[in-house]
């Protein structure tokens, strides 16, 4: 039987990339679970090991970092003293990682976002700054990128390749987020810019006999289409890596529409295990069946690789390895080999590897796997009904909005679902029907959570007492988080409902519910504050933030002062006033 995906990678995205013990843990998981690649994802990872030497006085014939350093150390010390020695230390570290991975048949890839560079180049190349804005169209950048990747593969010849995202504003400079108004930028189209940048990367990578993958990580449908146009002009050996959902890792979104639409190029599809937008594992959100379906469609679209991200660049010191969401990584590894593997088998493998069972017997695996499925199988439903509303993203990377305007900016602008599913354009409009649906979602989600949590009172034989105690603690924390999120989103949607004209009966009922919702927010903020005296991982207190809840309440109270004026205006529906 053939494997689901030929290429199965674990991706590290946080500063754990530079933590040897964490990288070894990832390599151990890859080996144990039959994966075959490690992706080290830091936006500046190439710039952390390459100066490049050419711009500091290195000779053309220099072929490694020490030869280059011998001709550049004085200039480096003058212009960038803190960066003088760091690159050759990090180069040795990464060479060791690549060598260790090769021993077990695992490829190592870099992933980044371009353009990225050290600020010293703005001093060395003053033409790059024009009227206070950085210019992405200056020819220097394309020369710089080509030199950077030439030196990279001289330093790390064992590196399998590079995955890059040229279409996001999260790089230091991109045509996508360009604020320069010079003549060069006026003439430069996104398609031309992407083509020139990708070409500058591809030439040295291909010359080294290695591979380049380009991501379609973009923030809008228009940007995705502009980048897709550049794909058509890329050399045939460049592949495309696509998030499984468009824009970002939102499990409520449809499949990324570019999957299967990249011509004959190799394709990878990317998944997030930790849960940047679905609770960080502080609220477990296990996505086994969602992923099984998405992977099946990806296989039908001739996708050959799958990537599973374990952490996030903006949340250092946290990882899927620290939470129940590690189940997602096991799911990715196992489904990536065989889409028919049963859900209970994935849970059992997670429990065995986490040493949660008294003994690794077929009987205990079966009993504990089935129990874990009943405990966690609907966990995504509970998160979906609190952090989302009618499938729209009402969370700021799993944190609660800080105010009224912030919430709708997140849901309808920054993370717009309507951009990818036009039927959702009015999903959050302040109507009675939408309000009822959103409030019901909160109630049903919390009920799902409580039914699942009841399994903790009926543990299976073979489960260690310590494992059960840990799960009980996790669920107590999750309960607080979901209750806080449900209260916050109830208050937000009631505030929006009251912010426009409504019939008198609906307004009176809405006002009563809004007042209760604000009281709930206050009570939960007090509970969160008391909980601060406990001792858990820092990310727990980031999500259970009393200060954040109180900020939201204060904003909504200020907003409520305008409700009386709104109530005096005629209702669009012509209702009673």
Predicted regions mapped to residue ranges:
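Conserved, well-structured beta-alpha core segment at the onset of a catalytic domain
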Residues: 1-11, 357-360, 364
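Aromatic-lined carbohydrate-binding surfaces of glycoside hydrolases
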Residues: 4-251, 278, 310-337, 379, ...
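P-loop NTPase catalytic cores that bind/hydrolyze ATP
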Residues: 298-307, 377-381
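Active-site clefts of carbohydrate-active enzymes
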Residues: 119-120, 170-177, 262-293, 308-310
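Noncatalytic carbohydrate-binding groove/subsite architecture in carbohydrate-active enzymes
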Residues: 224-239, 247-271, 277-279, 292-296, ...
């Amino acid at each position: 039987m053939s494997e689901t995906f030929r290429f199965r990678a674990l991706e590290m995205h946080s500063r754990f990339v530079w933590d040897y013990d964490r990288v070894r843990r990832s390599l151990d998981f890859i080996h144990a679970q039959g994966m075959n690649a490690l992706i080290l994802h830091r936006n500046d990872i190439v710039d952390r090991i390459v100066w490049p030497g050419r711009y500091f006085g290195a000779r053309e014939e220099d072929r490694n970092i020490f030869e280059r350093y011998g001709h550049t150390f004085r200039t480096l010390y003058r212009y960038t003293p803190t960066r003088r020695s760091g690159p050759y230390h990090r180069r040795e570290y990464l060479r060791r990682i690549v060598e260790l991975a090769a021993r077990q048949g695992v490829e190592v890839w870099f992933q980044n976002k371009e353009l990225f560079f050290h600020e010293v180049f703005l001093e060395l190349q003053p033409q790059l700054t024009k009227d206070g804005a950085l210019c992405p169209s200056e020819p220097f950048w394309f020369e710089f990128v080509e030199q950077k990747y030439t030196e990279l593969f001289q330093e790390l010849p064992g590196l399998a390749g590079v995955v890059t995202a040229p279409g996001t504003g999260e790089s230091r400079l991109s045509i996508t987020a360009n604020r320069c108004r010079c003549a060069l930028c006026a003439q430069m189209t996104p398609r031309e810019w992407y083509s020139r940048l990708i070409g500058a990367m591809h030439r040295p990578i291909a010359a080294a006999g290695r591979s380049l993958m380009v991501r379609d990580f973009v923030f809008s449908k228009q940007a995705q289409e502009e980048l897709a146009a550049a794909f058509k002009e890329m050399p045939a050996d460049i592949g495309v890596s696509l998030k499984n959902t468009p824009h970002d890792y939102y499990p409520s979104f449809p499949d990324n529409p570019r999957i299967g639409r990249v011509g004959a190029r190799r394709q990878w599809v990317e998944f997030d295990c930790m849960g940047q937008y679905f609770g960080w594992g502080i609220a477990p959100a296990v996505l086994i069946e969602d992923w099984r379906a998405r992977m099946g469609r990806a296989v039908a679209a001739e996708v050959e690789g799958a990537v599973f991200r374990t952490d996030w660049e903006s949340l250092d010191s946290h990882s899927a390895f620290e939470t129940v969401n590690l189940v997602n990584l096991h799911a990715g590894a196992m489904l990536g080999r065989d889409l028919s593997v049963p859900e209970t088998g994935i849970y059992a493998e997670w429990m065995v590897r986490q040493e949660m069972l008294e003994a690794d017997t077929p009987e205990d695996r079966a009993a504990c796997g089935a129990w874990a499925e009943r405990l966690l199988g609907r966990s995504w439903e509970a998160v979906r009904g609190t952090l989302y509303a009618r499938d729209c993203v009402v969370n700021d990377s799993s944190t609660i909005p800080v105010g009224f305007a912030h919430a709708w900016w997140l849901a309808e602008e920054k993370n717009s679902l309507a951009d990818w599913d036009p039927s959702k354009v009015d999903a959050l409009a302040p109507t009675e029907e939408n309000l009822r649906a959103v409030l019901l979602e909160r109630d049903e989600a919390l009920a799902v959570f409580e039914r699942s949590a009841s399994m903790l009172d009926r543990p299976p034989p073979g489960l260690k007492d310590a494992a059960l105690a840990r799960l009980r603690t996790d669920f107590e924390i999750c309960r607080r988080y979901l209750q806080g999120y449900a209260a916050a989103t109830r208050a937000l949607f009631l505030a929006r409902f009251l912010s426009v004209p409504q019939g008198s009966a609906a307004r009176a009922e809405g006002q009563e519910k809004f007042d209760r919702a604000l009281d709930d927010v206050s009570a939960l903020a007090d509970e969160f504050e008391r909980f601060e005296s406990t001792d858990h991982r820092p990310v727990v207190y980031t999500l259970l933030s009393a200060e954040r809840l109180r900020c939201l309440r204060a904003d909504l109270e200020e907003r409520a002062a305008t409700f009386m004026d709104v109530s005096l205006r005629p209702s669009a529906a012509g209702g009673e006033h």
